[in-house]
């Protein structure tokens, strides 16, 4: 198993513990303490992102999306993201988080990192609408391809596709592969 050099941003202690159980105690994490993420923590994340890089790995729920968005908005440059889906969480668990995901789902997420750069503009809103990428059926296909939660809004998906520098042709190919 390859060593992770970046610092992983998680929501809480149980998430850190789960990742360290899988990857070893040398793994470095920063805990946001859920939605109570503060400016001091954001500054620390920014500093580490500029030095070693960070991976944002938040829970696949509303709070996790909000925390991810807060961090990305605060950073000046590219940032790595890992995603698990709610389907990756144990059906018997009352919580929906990284700590409740299977080891395989976590490894898959960290092996398939997605780079976000908020300075990218690869897709216009007009192109997004005119190509029907906003339709729920197409959004589900796109989300499944990138391992995003299927319930993200059309505006969020549009923003994320731009940050990833995904072109119209790339999206058409993703949808076309699913339909064939």
From Swiss-Prot:
Binding-site residues for Mg(2+) 1, renumbered to this chain: 11, 59
Q: Which GO terms describe its cellular component?
A: cytoplasm
Q: Where is the Toprim domain?
A: 5-90
Q: What is its EC number?
A: 3.1.26.8
GO biological process: one example: rRNA processing
Q: What are the alphabetically sorted keywords of the record? A: Cytoplasm, Endonuclease, Hydrolase, Magnesium, Metal-binding, Nuclease, Ribosome biogenesis, RNA-binding, rRNA processing, rRNA-binding
- Supply the Gene3D superfamilies for this chain: 3.40.1360.10
Cofactor(s) of this protein: Mg(2+)
Q: Name one Pfam family in it.
A: DUF4093
Catalyzed reactions: Endonucleolytic cleavage of RNA, removing 21 and 42 nucleotides, respectively, from the 5'- and 3'-termini of a 5S-rRNA precursor
Which leading EC class covers this enzyme? hydrolase
Q: Which HAMAP family match?
A: RNase_M5 (MF_01469)
Its job: Required for correct processing of both the 5' and 3' ends of 5S rRNA precursor. Cleaves both sides of a double-stranded region yielding mature 5S rRNA in one step.
Task: Give the NCBIfam families listed for this entry.
Answer: 5S_RNA_mat_M5
Similarity section: Belongs to the ribonuclease M5 family.
Q: What is this protein called?
A: Ribonuclease M5
Q: Which organism is this protein's natural source?
A: Mycoplasma capricolum subsp. capricolum (strain California kid / ATCC 27343 / NCTC 10154)
Gene that encodes the chain: rnmV
